[in-house]
């Protein structure tokens, strides 16, 4: 049992350290919107992991893996959502540091929700959990309990790595949170979102 957990932890660590959509969202949010909003985005991403864990534990993930229609619907919704995020970043008007750092700045963006939806609307995450987690559930053990245990390990690692990224980004934000730099960063992040949207739209199970 210990060996199983150690093997899963190693695999989860490699997955966590691999740069992707979550990394881009956390870095951009932490630099342009501040440490607090960076943590909100990270918590949303982790909440999305728990939602997928619950879906897999309840057996609904098998439906996603078996049904092409269900997979395609979630895939296109996820791709459309990423494109919407990209458009929002492109149209965003960056503010200078002295304005962006004040408490009077309107807080209209729910970064927790954005992080969560970005994860939940990615069917690849569901397929990954469906195909990956069962390999580490010992025979005769409760699938529900072990699914949430494994997801919790993944989330803890994700939280630790997100904390490192957020702190690095927050320290650099004083130099990077300038209108032109934020605009450039928004466009780069938007480009990353568009690439992931295209990859998702063209993907198959």
Model-predicted regions and their roles:
Residues 6, 10, 105-117, 145-149, ...:
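Alpha-helical membrane-protein architecture signal
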Residues 147-170:
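Hydrophobic alpha-helical transmembrane segments of multi-pass membrane transport proteins
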Residues 65-95, 161-165, 175-205:
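Selective transmembrane alpha-helices of multi-pass membrane proteins
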Residues 2-72, 131-150:
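Juxtamembrane transmembrane-helix termini in multi-pass membrane transport proteins
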């Amino acid at each position: 049992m210990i060996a199983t957990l150690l093997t899963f932890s190693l695999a989860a660590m490699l997955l966590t350290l691999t740069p992707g959509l979550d990394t881009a969202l956390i870095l951009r949010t932490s630099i342009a919107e501040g440490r607090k909003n960076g943590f909100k985005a990270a918590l949303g991403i982790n909440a999305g992991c728990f939602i997928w864990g619950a879906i897999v534990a309840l057996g609904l993930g098998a439906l996603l893996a078996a049904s092409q229609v269900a997979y395609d619907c979630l895939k296109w919704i996820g791709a459309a959502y990423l494109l919407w995020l990209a458009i929002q970043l492109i149209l965003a008007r960056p503010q200078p540091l002295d304005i962006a750092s004040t408490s009077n700045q309107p807080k209209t963006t729910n970064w927790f929700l954005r992080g969560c939806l970005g994860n939940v609307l990615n069917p690849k995450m569901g397929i990954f959990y469906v195909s990956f987690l069962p390999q580490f559930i010992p025979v005769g053990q409760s699938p529900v309990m072990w699914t949430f245990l494994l997801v919790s390990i993944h989330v803890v690692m994700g939280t630790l790595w997100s904390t490192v990224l957020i702190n690095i980004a927050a320290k650099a934000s004083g130099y990077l949170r300038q209108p032109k730099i934020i605009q450039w960063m928004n466009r780069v992040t938007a480009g990353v979102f568009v690439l992931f949207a295209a990859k998702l739209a063209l993907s198959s199970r």
